[in-house]
From Swiss-Prot:
Residues 49-150, 179-293, 317-416, 426-535 form the SRCR domain. Transmembrane segments: none annotated. It is found in: Secreted, Extracellular space, Extracellular matrix, Basement membrane; Nucleus; Chromosome; Endoplasmic reticulum. This is Lysyl oxidase homolog 2. It catalyses: L-lysyl-[protein] + O2 + H2O = (S)-2-amino-6-oxohexanoyl-[protein] + H2O2 + NH4(+). SMART domains: SR. Disulfide bonds join 75-139, 88-149, 119-129, 209-282, 222-292, 256-266, 342-405, 355-415, 386-396, 455-521, 468-534, 502-512, 564-616, 570-686, 648-664, 654-676, 723-737. The modification 2',4',5'-topaquinone is found at residue 680. The lysine tyrosylquinone cross-link (LTQ) is generated by condensation of the epsilon-amino group of a lysine with a topaquinone produced by oxidation of tyrosine. Glycans are attached at residues 279, 446, 635. One of its GO terms (molecular function) is calcium ion binding. Residues 539-742 are annotated as: Lysyl-oxidase like. The keyword Ubl conjugation does not apply.
């Protein structure tokens, strides 16, 4: 029997008297350090911690603490790595990497809550560490402390950004909530959409009485389990079923308004007194039933029981840059152009409107500070205020002006999604860490479910990304075609899946195209079985389209000045027949500026030992294919292409306060840092397309970054830039340059037929 669960949670409730209401604060439980925790003080105030300030990554920032209804900072006096570890663990990271004094991440505002913090490293909260006391300090905000946490998350840790209440009185703990399917039609259904609402108290599951249960309560529970709304159910069937069973009821009731992101945010409806005659807590009622409506991506379909791939069909709102289904940076469509949302006043209620609009449940995290990467283009909405019942984010109140906002404040969300059980159909075996290993899948062969390996012949980054998504481990950092160094399960050595090819939208590896039962793997499994390595964050490369449009020009260059480029095959094949003394080549030249807007540095796939030295450029190239430069006819036929042999990756320039890390000279480390860009100027060798043989006409000019997807990115849709191009034999006009995915389909089609031009004259050098 299938049962929907949520992760362990603790609810602290206050019930002063029957008929009065109090809010339920929410305490996420997570795995603490391996050492046994010390004896906690009798009273440890409930706080929330966040990383704020001038930061570039989600796992670093100024430490801020929410206490007594107000956010405040922590002074750097006596702060240590022990304290940094506590802060990071409290936020769900396994450990701290470093801490920074003297307001490295900017000066905070308001109170300085803690000073002279002294931790031993085993506390569960910074509130348990010794200090001068709350608000007792002689510090200034120039001494605000910051931390950088490890990328690795604590397994199973769930974040709630609901602010805690301030309660006194009776302490009641609820350990878990579930929907338990009762009718046979729902017991084998995936996902579980209907059943009794039950809570776990002191290790035992108990039903919730329906005498004070409402559809608003059901809406909240459905949202917790990844469903956008509740629906009616057959009350007669459940009444008949309930009368035949003895039930153990929870002695409390809940009173939700319907817009809460979690049952823990609802109010306590009162204590249910037992009937004096029957001694039953719910003698006049029955167990509360919850029936949910799944979103499009999770609705049952004939033959499979679920959709094979998640395809975003919502025309007004989308999520970008997330590792998993139901998470990402929020983008909205306005006047045909996609733009982001500023995180001012961003909260779970507003985030839940987006999640439900996209067919998911309520929001489990409302993320601020571009935690899932920075977007591009306009910021369309700011200071959004929703009541939680809107059909679309555009129905909420918001400020159309975004003064003071920038893409460092892009809002993001993680939604509750239905439990499909996909994570139980694949595993990683033999790796040094839980995030890497040989891929083993559970497949039906000859009527029996068995574990086996995946043939690596067609294995690449996109397939590895699906595995990491399926396991909830983030993005793929590497896709391995040899795994002899990982000793997997000896009983799973046989190849059970081959010919795997994924598009990137699938929710599990089984949804990708593959050979099915007709496994064909000439190279065999064993050392050639597929493997992956997963990471929580990924880079995101975006080309500056405006710069390409502004710097494009034609140059007639003599062949004797192109000797090095000719040797590197940067010219069209007809250059082999061109006179080296009197001939020339017509070059379409331009500058390209490639930004890393993601959450991790972009690093070449190959190690330093495989880099190639280029005499002409006098440095090593780390990627053989980093970009494609193509000139296409209007029907997509390629008529000319750039032949830039390979690339050296470095930080040409960076945003303010970001240090360059990568440089090509002197065999330096190569890559592109988050917040930096690599500039290829129009006047360097091979930064062109040889159009000597191209006839006059209208064309598309296209640039694709990381075309073979050798390096994993959080978003590949923005790796393509396309321009309209008109060439009359002597002059060229480049116009309507834009990044893939930045406009609606309708607007994209208009661009392809728009005739606005920029005049770029012929240059002779």
């Amino acid at each position: 029997m299938l049962v929907s669960h949520v992760f362990l949670l603790t609810l602290s409730l206050s019930v002063p008297s029957l008929g009065q209401y109090e809010h339920w604060p929410y305490y996420p439980e997570y795995q603490g350090p391996p050492e046994p925790p010390p004896t906690q003080p009798k009273i440890v105030p409930q706080i929330h911690v966040r990383l704020a300030g001038e930061k570039r990554k989600h796992n670093e920032g100024r430490v801020e603490v929410y206490y007594e209804g107000e956010w405040g900072t922590v002074c750097d006096d006596d702060f240590s790595m022990y304290a940094a570890h506590i802060v990071c663990r409290e936020l769900g990271y396994q450990e701290a990497v470093s801490w920074s004094p003297s307001s490295k991440y900017g000066k905070g505002e308001g109170r300085i809550w803690l000073d002279n913090v002294n931790c031993n490293g085993r506390e569960r909260s910074i509130a348990s560490c010794s200090s001068n006391g709350w608000g007792v300090t002689d510090c200034k905000h120039s001494e605000d402390v910051g931390v950088q946490c490890s990328d690795r998350r604590i397994p199973g840790f769930k974040v709630s950004n609901e602010l805690p209440g301030h309660l006194e009185g009776l302490n009641i703990q609820v350990e878990d909530v579930r929907i338990r399917p009762i009718l046979s039609a729902y017991r084998k259904r995936v996902p579980v959409t209907e059943g009794f609402a039950e809570v776990k108290v002191q290790g035992s599951w108990r039903q919730v009485c329906n005498t004070q249960w409402s559809s608003k309560n059901s809406r909240v529970v459905c949202g917790m389990f990844g469903f956008p709304s509740e629906k009616k159910y057959n009350t007669k069937v459940y009444k008949m079923f309930s009368s035949r069973r003895k039930h153990t009821y929870w002695q409390f009731s809940a009173n939700c308004t319907g817009n809460e992101p979690h049952l823990s945010s609802c109010k306590v409806g009162g204590v249910l007194s037992p009937d004096p005659k029957t001694n039953q807590t719910c003698s006049d009622g029955a167990p509360a039933v919850v029936s949910c409506t799944p979103g499009r991506a999770f609705a049952p379909s004939p033959g499979t029981g679920f959709r094979k791939a998640f395809r975003q069909e919502q025309p007004l709102v989308r999520l970008r840059g997330g590792a998993n289904v139901g998470e990402g940076r929020v983008e909205v469509l306005k006047n045909g152009e996609w733009g982001t949302v500023c995180d001012d006043k961003w909260n779970l209620v507003t985030a839940s409107v987006i999640c439900r609009e996209l067919g998911f449940g309520s929001a489990k995290e409302a993320l601020v500070g571009a935690q899932l990467g920075q977007g591009m283009g306009q910021i369309h909405m700011s200071e959004i205020q929703c009541n939680g019942f809107e059909k679309s984010l555009t129905d909420c109140k918001f400020n159309i002006h975004s003064q003071g906002c920038n893409h460092e404040e892009d809002a993001a969300v993680r939604c509750n999604v239905p439990a499909m059980g996909f994570e139980n159909q694949v595993r990683l075996s033999g790796g040094r860490h839980p995030t890497e290993g040989r891929v083993e899948v559970l497949m039906e062969r000859n009527g029996t479910l068995r574990w086996g390996t995946v043939c690596s012949e067609t294995w690449g980054t996109m397939e590895a990304m699906i595995v990491c998504r399926q396991l909830g481990l983030g993005f793929a950092s590497h896709a391995f075609q040899e795994t002899w160094y990982w000793q997997g399960d000896i009983n799973a050595d046989d190849v059970v899946m081959s010919g795997v090819k994924c598009s990137g939208t699938e929710m599990s590896l089984a949804h990708c195209r593959h050979d099915g039962a007709n496994v064909n793997c000439p190279r065999g499994g064993g050392r050639f079985a597929a493997g992956v390595s997963c990471v929580e964050t990924a880079p995101d490369l975006v080309l500056n389209a405006a710069l390409v449009e502004q710097t494009t020009y034609l140059e007639d260059r003599p062949m004797f000045m192109l000797q090095c480029a000719h040797e590197e095959q940067c010219l069209a094949s007809s250059a082999d027949r061109t006179s080296p003394t009197t001939g020339y080549r017509r070059l379409l030249r331009f500058s390209s500026q490639i930004h890393n807007n993601g959450q991790a540095d972009f690093r070449p796939k190959t190690g330093r030992h495989a880099w190639i030295w280029h005499d002409c450029h006098r440095h090593y190239h780390s990627m053989e294919v980093f970009t494609h430069y193509d000139l296409l006819t209007l029907n997509g036929t390629k008529v000319a292409e750039g032949h830039k042999a390979s690339f050296c990756l470095e930080d040409s320039e960076c945003e303010a306060d970001i240090q360059k890390q990568y440089v090509c000279a002197n065999f330096g480390e190569q890559g592109i840092t988050v917040g930096c860009w690599d500039l290829y100027r129009h006047d360097i060798d091979c930064q062109w397309v040889d159009i000597t043989d191209v006839a006059p006409g209208d064309y598309f000019f296209q640039i694709i970054i990381n075309p073979n997807q050798e390096v994993a990115e959080s978003d590949y849709t923005n790796n393509i830039m396309k321009c309209r191009c008109r060439y009359d034999g002597q002059r060229i006009w480049m116009y309507n340059c834009h990044i893939g995915g930045s406009y609606s389909t309708e607007t994209e089609e208009k661009f392809e037929h728009f005739s606005g031009l920029l005049n770029n004259q012929l240059s002779t050098r």
